[in-house]
Structures are given as C-alpha cells and as structure tokens.
Amino acid sequence: MGNNVVGAYIGVGSNIEPESNIVDALTRLSKHVDITGISSFYKTAPLLRENQNDYLNGVWQISTSISPDELKNGVLRRIEKELHRNRESDKYAPRTIDLDILLYGDMVMQEDDLTIPDPDICKRSFIAFPLLELKPDLVMPDSKAPLVNLLGALSKENMIPDKIFTESLRSMVNK
C-alpha cells in the first residue's frame, strides 16, 4: 500500500441490477484499496426522474495510498466502465454503478473534474446519513463544521434501509 495511507469515503449508487453491480464493484475495488467500513445501504427514489427504478445508495470507507486523481480516474471510473456505466449527457440517467470520492483524508481540492469534499454531501440525504453512520463526529475539511450541524432540512424520511443487502456486503469484507 505504500507509506502515506489515507482514509477516504466513496459514495456508491446503482439502479440497474443494483445488488449484483454493487457487489461486483466492491469486489473490484477491494483489489486496489482496503475496505475499512460499509454503511447501511438504502433504497431511495431517483432524483428528478419518476420513470426509473429505485436506487440502492450507501458509502464505503477505504484506506489507500492511491492519489485522489488516480483513485477517481484510474480505479473508480475504470470499475464504472467495466460495469458498463454510461456517463453521457444526462446526469440523472439510470446507472449500473456510480462511484464518487466524497472525502479524502482532510484534503480540500477543486479541480475541473474533482472537488473534495464532494459538494453533494450536504445536499443529499443518501450521502450524508451513511457518511455520518461511519463517522458520527465527522468535521468537514473545508468548512471546519461538524457534518451533523450542516444537515439542515435533510431527512431520512424517504430512505428505506436494506438490512439484508447491507449485511451481505459487510460479510464480504469481514472475513
């Protein structure tokens, strides 16, 4: 793994055969990084689309020495491509898998194709609550504010926990 090992968090989502695609993505990712935590996974309605299947969303905690750019473009995007993710024009289109770096240690960065922390953390319940589950005392590296204080109007109301699927994922890494 190298010397500079960093804790990071990956947002995970799928609404095309989510159970098999998320398991497949976890297996592939575990060949590149150490998976150190798996949040509860939730069934959630698709954003801004009514004629799509529900999503399964959650967060993976990892430990890695891979740089953020290499993690995104060399590992996560490659896994998405291998699982036939189509990253075309409609950012709300159905997807086989969506893997996003949410946090990478205490890093704050803004580049053309990568912003850390991910700006959606405080906007999307299906990212914020699983992240808090893994790290309840999380302080956001950019604002220095505790995440729990930034949730505002976010609610778990429309998030349905999938306990059986969550346990099956956790059993994959807790061997």
List the model feature ranges, each with a label:
Residues 2-12, 16-95, 105-106:
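Nucleotide and nucleotide-moiety/phosphate-recognizing core
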Residues 47-54, 69-73, 78-175:
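Flexible, gly/pro- and Lys/Arg-enriched active-site loops
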